[in-house]
Amino acid sequence: MSRVGKKPIPIPAKTKVTVSNGTVTVQGEKGKLERPLHPDVELKIEGDEITVVPVVERRKITAVQGLVRSLVANMVTGVSTGFKRVLEVNGIGYKAELNGQTLNLTLGFSHPVDFPLPQGITAEVDKKNNITLEGIDNELLGQTAASIRALRPPEPYKGKGIKYAEERIIRKAGKTGA
């Protein structure tokens, strides 16, 4: 049995979990998420806990059990409290503005970059050029944050670019004049 997979997932109050036709549906205060369930595992809902049980005990299914448990736990957390990622825009002349569901970024290119936010993701930009992304789907939120960061990743000499707030950029020394 998987160490992660055998841990039960607590279901918070005001959150409802249902399994039907190989699909897990989690509904809570912030919204509703659906995900297809792997055919080699099944969910057992007992009271206010969910357990992921493998159909057949095999080594590969043990890995899948841990994965499914983490995905369902993220769904439950997402619909009850939500997820949040913060990106920092560093550099002279680099700035971010929010225009509806489009993020307008000036990143030192010859043109401004317009990044349309996917449905289910909300953004906020403060004056210090911090972009705060929020949503209930952890996978979509992480992919959106990574796509925004990929527009101008931080460079190691001056640290200019877009980075995660908790990310530490390892700096390099510049050329030494002879």
Curated annotation (Swiss-Prot):
Keyword Mitochondrion: no
Gene3D superfamilies with a match to the protein in the record: Ribosomal protein L6, alpha-beta domain
Chain segments annotated as transmembrane: none
Top-level taxon in the UniProt lineage: Bacteria
GO biological process, alphabetically ordered: cytoplasmic translation
Any matching Pfam family: Ribosomal_L6
Keywords: Ribonucleoprotein, Ribosomal protein, RNA-binding, rRNA-binding
GO molecular function, one term: rRNA binding
Gene Ontology CC entries for this record: cytosolic large ribosomal subunit
Cited HAMAP family: Ribosomal_uL6_B
Annotated family: Belongs to the universal ribosomal protein uL6 family.
Oligomer status and interactors: Part of the 50S ribosomal subunit.
UniProt function note: This protein binds to the 23S rRNA, and is important in its secondary structure. It is located near the subunit interface in the base of the L7/L12 stalk, and near the tRNA binding site of the peptidyltransferase center.
Name by which UniProt lists this protein: Large ribosomal subunit protein uL6
Organism: Desulfatibacillum aliphaticivorans
High-level lineage: Bacteria, Pseudomonadati, Thermodesulfobacteriota, Desulfobacteria, Desulfobacterales
Gene: rplF
